[in-house]
A protein has these predicted regions:
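Protein kinase glycine-rich loop
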Residues: 13-20, 25
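Conserved N-lobe loop of protein kinases adjacent to the ATP-binding glycine-rich P-loop
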Residues: 29-36
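AlphaC helix of the eukaryotic protein kinase fold
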Residues: 43-65
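Activation segment of protein kinases
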Residues: 50, 144-167
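Activation-segment/catalytic-loop signature of the eukaryotic protein kinase fold
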Residues: 77
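Conserved short submotifs of the Hanks-type protein kinase catalytic core
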Residues: 81-95, 99
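Activation segment signature within eukaryotic-like protein kinase domains
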Residues: 114-115
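Protein kinase catalytic-loop region centered on the HRD/HxD motif
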Residues: 118-130
């Protein structure tokens, strides 16, 4: 996607803020609600796999029911002429991976605080029957004010095969 593009007649792409194996993440302006959001867009090489697309959408919809201070909120999911996207809360901060790279070894107090916040987010997801399955430093965001949030619930389950449910 290019800066200035409008997705779903609503989200104006402002620039790329991250990339992963299956999707790119952009900062965008939601013109309907007048706020900044993160828009995760499925990479083109995955757009032809209908099974993957179904899982991507259903898991994103499942993650959207999660509302917790330690989970990145999902606001919307859809596709715009073959551009499959998930709209999420925009967290101004860095991933735990970036944080560790910059800071080096964490203190016991800091590591414990991060672990507790991640655990609280995962517990909230588990109470809704949602399993993350891809918890790693890249999927943990530390906001500018120190709040820790887990992200990538939808894509994590959609990306692995035969994972729709473990009831």
């Amino acid at each position: 996607l290019k800066t200035g593009m409008i997705v779903a007649e609503r989200y104006e792409i402002l620039g790329k803020i991250g990339t992963g194996g299956m999707a790119d993440v952009y900062k965008a302006k939601d013109h309907k609600l007048n706020r900044f959001v993160a828009v995760k867009v499925l990479k083109p090489e995955f757009r032809e796999d209908t099974t993957f697309i179904k899982k991507f959408r259903s898991e994103a919809q499942a993650a959207a029911v999660l509302t917790h201070p330690n989970i990145v909120n999902v606001f919307d999911v859809g596709d715009d002429n073959g551009v499959y996207y998930i709209v999420m809360e925009l967290i101004e901060g860095i991933t735990l991976k970036e944080y560790i790279s910059k800071k080096g070894k964490l203190s016991v107090k800091e590591a414990t605080s991060i672990a507790i916040q991640v655990s609280m987010g995962l517990e909230a997801a588990h109470s809704h029957g949602i399993v993350h399955r891809d918890v790693k430093p890249q999927n943990i965001i530390i906001s500018m004010d120190g709040k820790v949030k887990v992200t990538d619930f939808g894509i994590a389950r959609a990306a692995s095969s035969n994972t729709i449910s473990s009831n």
